[in-house]
From Swiss-Prot:
The lineage of its organism: Bacteria, Pseudomonadati, Pseudomonadota, Alphaproteobacteria, Hyphomicrobiales. Residues 26-46 bind DNA. InterPro entries: LexA (IPR006200), LexA-like (IPR039418), LexA/Signal_pep-like_sf (IPR036286), LexA_DNA-bd_dom (IPR006199), LexA_repressor (IPR050077), Peptidase_S24_LexA (IPR006197), Peptidase_S24_S26A/B/C (IPR015927), WH-like_DNA-bd_sf (IPR036388). It comes from Nitrobacter winogradskyi (strain ATCC 25391 / DSM 10237 / CIP 104748 / NCIMB 11846 / Nb-255). Its EC number is 3.4.21.88. Pfam families: LexA_DNA_bind (PF01726), Peptidase_S24 (PF00717). This is LexA repressor. HAMAP family: LexA. GO terms for biological process: DNA repair; DNA replication; negative regulation of DNA-templated transcription; proteolysis; SOS response. The record marks 119-120 as: Cleavage.
Amino acid sequence: MLTRKQYELLRFINERLKESGVPPSFDEMKDALDLRSKSGIHRLITALEERGFIRRLPNRARAIEVIKLPELAASGGGRRGFTPSVIEGNLGKVRRGGGGGADEAERPVAVPVMGRIAAGTPIEALQTCSHTISLPPDMLGAGEHYALEVRGDSMVDAGILDGDMALIQRNPTADTGDIVVALIDDEEATLKRFRRRGASIALEPANAAYEVRILPPNRVQIQGRLVGIYRKY
């Protein structure tokens, strides 16, 4: 399965080849995927080549051949329950009862922004609400939610970019494979993919430039699960 960014890049290369017969430059790929550096494109190209979707031709500049496309193009990134560039349900905290009627149902819900979260080197956890963002009611579901501003690029291959607003469902537990807010040693907060490895916890980046952190459970507190990304263009 491809991540969303891998699929977007593969589609962009394929469309450019069909239009002009020449693959896009790395700068064009970077701009098309809204990445900050070409190193992210290099990693995506390598991943696509390793999975057999493209082939780089030796001794030729900008020589990329698309070998195949995913059978289920609509599936995007293959991450269950999370589509990085789209805000999906379970956002905010639903207030039930009270008979507010149609006007109440259409009123935007304010979700608190609790500070910054590192997608890179963990940063000091922030616990105070700096402001709120308003979300439409059709995106709401049960449970309490908050938002954190993403800082860093360690989750770019999961479609999470520096400056995005991560929408978090407050929850002290997580399933293997979930992207979570992890508090380390009661001091540092980071956004990573959660996995259990024997008696330890692995916090995995989605960027080959960063290392997986393996920690004992007593050093890690799960403070919520990622349910969506809010991005301004």
